[in-house]
């Protein structure tokens, strides 16, 4: 039982849900570029590099957030909060993972992906985690940029080129993350307020946040349509994505009448997961 608990604690520090979400996005971007030709070796190298680099960022984020994690109710039981003496070890493990991931990327994938991974890591750790998360409401927007790079890495691992399609993917995934993240902020509003973290709902309130969520869902909807035409993805993708985005938008508008903001945010969050999961699956297998 002791060893099971140790493994669970280690997995918690790596934030496996975030890694899995990033892997799925990488596969979506890969699928858009590969157009039905799945190269298993390249996909494996992409996945391994992402696991190491994103895992490294997640571990360091745990270290950086120790001071606020001990204040928020939902994070008080995290490993590095309870056992602060492991922080130095966590930093060493994170730096080793980063080094190994970047070496794999530059040696076996390409320099474009290496630069994208490094840019995402630096943005997430220094600009987002160290500075903006605790000082500014725009932290979510900056975090969305680093969070939207995995699908670009998947795309560029095939094309070895950052083009207009990869730029649209970047915009599309960044736009998706805003309503997704704002919904999380509403759901955990009390924790963020107690910890004095200036997330958008805390600074501007629920009403303005709701309108921003709706606006970003509409912009995301447009970016998905643009992707269909600039990359010539088949119309099966367009039809399915149209109904998915329309449903997400419908719930965001319908739920405006609900006075319970957390119930509204819960539905927005749930649909954000459904939409991005299914879109990535279609992007990966849409050409097969």
From Swiss-Prot:
The chain crosses the membrane at residues 6-26, 44-64, 89-109, 111-131, 138-158, 169-189, 213-233, 238-258, 268-288. It is an enzyme of class 2 (transferase). Its main location: membrane. Pathway: Porphyrin-containing compound metabolism; heme O biosynthesis; heme O from protoheme: step 1/1. It catalyses: heme b + (2E,6E)-farnesyl diphosphate + H2O = Fe(II)-heme o + diphosphate. Its EC number is 2.5.1.141. One of its GO terms (molecular function) is protoheme IX farnesyltransferase activity. It is a multi-pass membrane protein. It is found in: Cell membrane. One of its GO terms (cellular component) is plasma membrane. GO terms for biological process: heme O biosynthetic process. Keywords: Cell membrane, Heme biosynthesis, Membrane, Transferase, Transmembrane, Transmembrane helix. It comes from the Bacteria. InterPro entries: Protohaem_IX_farnesylTrfase, UbiA_prenyltransferase, UbiA_prenylTrfase_CS, UbiA_sf. Converts heme B (protoheme IX) to heme O by substitution of the vinyl group on carbon 2 of heme B porphyrin ring with a hydroxyethyl farnesyl side group. Belongs to the UbiA prenyltransferase family. Protoheme IX farnesyltransferase subfamily. Carbon 2 of the heme B porphyrin ring is defined according to the Fischer nomenclature. This is Protoheme IX farnesyltransferase. It comes from Buchnera aphidicola subsp. Baizongia pistaciae (strain Bp).
């Amino acid at each position: 039982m002791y060893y099971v608990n140790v493994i669970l604690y280690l997995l918690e520090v790596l934030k496996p849900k975030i890694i899995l979400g990033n892997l799925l996005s990488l596969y979506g971007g890969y699928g858009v570029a590969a157009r039905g030709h799945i190269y298993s070796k390249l996909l494996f190298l992409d996945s391994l590099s992402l696991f190491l680099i994103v895992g490294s960022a997640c571990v360091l984020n745990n270290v950086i957030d120790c001071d606020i994690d001990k204040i928020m109710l939902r994070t008080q039981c995290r490993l590095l909060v309870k056992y602060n003496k492991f922080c130095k070890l966590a930093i060493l493990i994170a730096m080793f993972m980063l080094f190994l991931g970047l070496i794999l990327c530059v040696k076996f994938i390409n320099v474009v992906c290496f630069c994208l991974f490094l840019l995402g890591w630096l943005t997430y750790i220094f600009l987002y985690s160290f500075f903006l998360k605790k000082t500014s409401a725009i932290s979510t927007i900056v975090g969305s940029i680093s969070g939207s790079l995995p699908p670009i890495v998947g795309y560029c691992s095939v094309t070895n080129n950052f083009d207009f399609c990869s730029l649209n993917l970047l915009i599309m995934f960044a736009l998706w993350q805003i309503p997704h993240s704002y919904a999380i902020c509403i759901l955990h509003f009390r924790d963020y307020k107690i910890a004095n973290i200036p997330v958008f709902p805390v600074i501007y309130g629920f009403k303005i946040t709701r309108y921003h969520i709706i606006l970003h869902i509409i912009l995301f909807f447009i970016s998905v349509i643009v992707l269909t035409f600039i990359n010539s993805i088949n119309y099966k993708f367009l039809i399915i994505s149209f109904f998915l985005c329309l449903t997400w938008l419908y719930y965001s508008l319908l739920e405006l009448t609900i006075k319970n903001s957390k119930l509204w945010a819960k539905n927005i969050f749930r649909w954000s997961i459904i939409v991005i999961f299914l879109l990535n699956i279609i992007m990966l297998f849409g050409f097969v």
